[in-house]
């Protein structure tokens, strides 16, 4: 690591802490039912929405009722996003006259945005109209994030409630999370981004003349905006000569704000946050990284306030930060190192006043290695998936760390709501292991952890590894899966592993060398995204319901403290052992082998 990397990481974490603490207090109020001081006008609008929807905000739900409402809402959202894409050509706000999106790509995209994954097999500026981007995709950026916040509110109530059968009202949690948190923060972040040069307009695309014509090859695109493939599934290339360049326009800033705050990650442009119209300056880059971590970090303090012990929130935040700092240091160091192949040729790759040094392939010069690697660590730790550099161009070890951050279960800060409830499931597992070692019935926050909670926690922990490993195995065995692998050997395997890791853990970033916009990958990855999201949420809600029905025991001399360094170490160890061990053989076949091949 360079001095610049260390300072950048330290400043980022310090600013994050300063912003997250007061937001966490505010989020605890949003998670309650009482009006918030100074926002009476918004409370009246909230009540108006309930009346319009015919919903009784005072009705509490059991965990099953909560889960059913959540699933119905998200299934309807999936159908809506799919329908908008399939009818795009006949809808307004389509100045480029884009055609309807293909059925398999529409299905993949609908599931992706509803599941808070935002995996994109398409290029946004060449496929989606302004209406599709704003109404369907940006709308789900809000709703999927609000769903995650609702689930963590329900789980926290499971710990704080005593001997009740309810865990809250899904419609209230969804509405309040959107009105009081996501919308106001998005307006603020969008204005800041516009001040840095992020565009916000409804203009048609601009054609500008090039100084010199350029001849190039690219995959041929059909009338539906999807690549044309031959009988073997390989893309058909066409040779083109360009005399002008088309510069895409659009309402970018409004989508960029919620894309980051909601840990969604789906870019308006194909280049995502590497595009200068999405992320033009070093300051906008810092703002976007802070936006990704802001709500996940704040929810740790929300957790502490709602359970009545701020030390619990600090302990969870400490475990997350420890894992994040260590893994970020590794990826920064890996990308700053000289490439052995170039070193053998005598190429100077050292950092100096004249050059960044290290591996600059796939990185924007306006960001450099430090800001690019920190962004990569942030976006994969937080299940966001936005990128300001191409992860496929990272070194083998540099690319492995983002993969590992996702494979930990997206609990290192994680997504909005999802990161904290994932880490709390690991905390339940940690106290269970500790209870076995000392021969006591395990407790967490005064609630006994018994067989039912452990069964549900086991489901939460095992669902995603099964989806990742099974999906990867199928893809590298079947011909349609192998047809999308453009890079042979270990790196090609890493691309497939990364794709299913990203999909099942609801991240959405990719090793872009994989041709994933095919019926095979669109369907397979959609399945991984759907079950990676909702097959985890339902057991979490079951845990919440079970805990809420239990009495809260008083602390005594035999109670294991869950707020000190010992518990943090136990929690980190549990995350590493359970999270990483599932994937060691797969990682050995991919990035580890590729790293060793550098020294041949």
From Swiss-Prot:
GO terms for molecular function: P-type potassium transmembrane transporter activity; potassium ion binding. GO terms for cellular component: plasma membrane. It is a multi-pass membrane protein. It comes from the Bacteria. It holds the Pfam family KdpA. It is found in: Cell inner membrane. The chain crosses the membrane at residues 6-26, 65-85, 136-156, 179-199, 283-303, 314-334, 367-387, 419-439, 458-478, 523-543, 566-586. Its main location: membrane. Keywords: Cell inner membrane, Cell membrane, Ion transport, Membrane, Potassium, Potassium transport, Transmembrane, Transmembrane helix, Transport. NCBIfam families: kdpA. Part of the high-affinity ATP-driven potassium transport (or Kdp) system, which catalyzes the hydrolysis of ATP coupled with the electrogenic transport of potassium into the cytoplasm. This subunit binds the periplasmic potassium ions and delivers the ions to the membrane domain of KdpB through an intramembrane tunnel. Belongs to the KdpA family. The system is composed of three essential subunits: KdpA, KdpB and KdpC. HAMAP family: KdpA. This is Potassium-transporting ATPase potassium-binding subunit. It comes from Janthinobacterium sp. (strain Marseille) (Minibacterium massiliensis).
